[in-house]
From Swiss-Prot:
PANTHER family: HISTIDINOL-PHOSPHATE AMINOTRANSFERASE, HISTIDINOL-PHOSPHATE AMINOTRANSFERASE-RELATED. The modification N6-(pyridoxal phosphate)lysine is found at residue 212. Its EC number is 2.6.1.9. Keywords: Amino-acid biosynthesis, Aminotransferase, Histidine biosynthesis, Pyridoxal phosphate, Transferase. Pathway: Amino-acid biosynthesis; L-histidine biosynthesis; L-histidine from 5-phospho-alpha-D-ribose 1-diphosphate: step 7/9. Its cofactor is pyridoxal 5'-phosphate. Signal peptide: none annotated. This is Histidinol-phosphate aminotransferase. It catalyses: L-histidinol phosphate + 2-oxoglutarate = 3-(imidazol-4-yl)-2-oxopropyl phosphate + L-glutamate. Belongs to the class-II pyridoxal-phosphate-dependent aminotransferase family. Histidinol-phosphate aminotransferase subfamily. The keyword Amino-acid biosynthesis applies. Homodimer. The keyword Nuclease does not apply.
Length: 357
């Protein structure tokens, strides 16, 4: 061990970093592994004040997002992607070495990585066979749990968590823990948002992003919706200038009437492509099951997923391997691309009839 490594915190030395799509790499021309929108938006920078520091919480961005989400501006915090929101909640509410977070695998990996980075215990309540919450398991672990993360629609399974279960969880956790509902993909099923419950449940927190339906993954702009008291606590630990001036500029444009209309058109396009791809995949011999989805990706179980993954990788089609997630043996996640990209996937898979493990 080098002297530098010895200086590092023990938990950081032992940390396995989150394996993002870009970290995993690849040399493809069909990128269907990061749940990105397939086309770049046509925004142009309009602000020319790069010599000045930006606002900590850009007023125009906050106001426009509040109007879009149907909440009050004091219930909104903007950050460097929803990932920063995940981290801020742990920093503000969890004592390292004492408190815990809880999440429900299979799910998004950054909840665990963020907690481990700050020396906070990670607890899990594995989802049931239908990928719904195991409320009994969660309730049994509430003592010492400060933050509960639930992803709905869930990444990578694509399903919504039952609303009655979310309400039961909120009632169960009241006075004990924050319940954080990650709505990164909510634009694909807006009727399922829990933002309408914010005034009813002061411990409810909602995470949002411009990375998915708004087609701005490269912008790194996310939002936390919560009770004003929670927002004020998060403002104590957020960096003084979380959003650069160009990011705030583009985010405000994306949240204009025209920007929101374009986002809704994106959603219609992706939803249509998802239906087409789901139907096309069901008759392919190497596929065991195509799971229903309320998002911009499909989870698919293959007869021999490692072979499928490598074969498509070699053809420049990059998917996301989910085999290491609990209960997802044999599964790959396919982002919904444009029609050409979806057709490439189908053609590549049709060339693999009868593939076996």
């Amino acid at each position: 061990m080098s002297n530098i490594e010895q200086l590092a915190r023990a938990n950081v030395r032992a940390l396995t970093p989150y394996q993002s799509a870009r970290r995993l790499g690849g040399n493809g021309d069909v990128w269907l592994n990061a749940n990105e929108y397939p086309e770049a938006p046509a925004f142009q920078l309009t602000l020319q004040t790069l010599n000045r520091y930006p606002e900590c919480q850009p007023v125009q961005v906050i106001n426009r997002y509040a109007e879009y989400a149907g909440v009050q501006p004091e219930q909104v915090l903007v950050s460097r992607g929803a990932d920063e929101g995940i981290e801020l909640l742990i920093r503000a509410f969890c004592e390292p070495g004492k408190d815990a977070i809880l999440f429900c695998p299979p799910t998004y990996g950054m909840y665990a990585v963020s907690a481990e980075t700050f020396g906070v215990e990670r607890r899990t309540a594995a989802s049931k066979a239908d990928w719904q919450l195991d409320l009994e398991s969660i309730e049994a672990q509430l003592d010492g749990t400060k933050v509960i993360y639930v992803c709905s629609p869930n990444n990578p399974t694509g399903n919504l968590i039952a609303r009655e279960d979310l309400r039961q969880l909120l009632t169960m956790a009241q006075g004990n823990a924050l319940v954080v509902i990650d709505e990164a993909y909510i634009e694909f099923c807006p009727q399922a948002t829990t933002a309408v419950w914010l005034d009813e449940f002061p411990h409810l927190v909602i995470l949002r992003t411009l990375s998915k339906a708004f087609s701005l993954a490269g912008l790194r702009c996310g939002f936390t919706l919560a009770n004003p008291e929670v927002i004020q606590l998060l403002l104590k630990v957020i960096a003084p200038y979380p959003l650069s001036t160009p990011v705030a500029d583009i985010a405000a444009q994306a949240l204009s009437r025209e920007g929101i209309a374009k986002m809704k058109a994106n959603v219609e396009e992706i939803t249509s492509a998802r239906r087409w791809l789901s139907d096309a995949l069901k008759d392919i011999p190497c596929i065991e099951e195509v799971f229903p989805s309320e998002s911009n990706y499909l989870l698919v179980r293959f007869t021999a997923s490692p072979s499928v993954f490598k074969t498509l990788w070699d053809q420049g089609i990059i998917l996301r391997d989910q085999n290491k997630q609990p209960s997802l043996a044999g599964c790959l996640r396919i982002t919904i691309g444009n029609r050409y990209e979806c057709e490439r996937v189908v053609a590549a898979l049709q060339s693999l009839p009868g593939i076996n493990a």
